[in-house]
Amino acid sequence: MATFYASKTGEVSAREKEHSALVRELAGECMTLLENDGTLPLAGAGKVAVYGNGVRHTVKGGTGSGDVNTRTVVTIEQGLKEAGFEILTGKWLDEYDKVLADAQAAYQAELAKKAEELHIPIFAVMFSEAFAQPDVPAITEKEDTDTAIYVLSRNSGEGADRYNRACDYLLGENELADIAYLAEHYEKTVLILNIANLVDTT
């Protein structure tokens, strides 16, 4: 009879708890601080304006075998809230959720159409037709805080799914404008690169 070493129940095992604690400890050591003008660390929990495509849709790993199954994924939004921060930009984040959902629905419809035309599975079309991430909404108002955080996310997998275009290797038009807006209107601005690949920030 074969021996199974994986968990056999839905309970969180002691091994998982131990490994989760280790991952939490190591995560900070795996992040790189590229530049700091005294903004970090933030003085303490308080009101923050948080923008960017990675706030709620945080990238935890690449696609394909670069992605692993986990019980939970803590987004940057969740992490900030659990740390006691009050996020003032829920309306903007909701707006981006809709933009992303609409783009994903259009992508799935296009995949289905091409799969039918070519008489191949939808999965096969995905290898040649990577999802084009939509640009973010424009930021037009300053929130009642001196601190803004912008989370720029990019994801990719094992195939030819990166392109030298806006909202991919390059920043989108609104991404560039939004980051410039935050730098101009907030005393403290933090840019987080939540990326599983290269991105041109020049």
Model-derived segments and spans:
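C-terminal non-catalytic regions of proteins with extracellular/luminal or membrane-system context
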Residues: 1-202
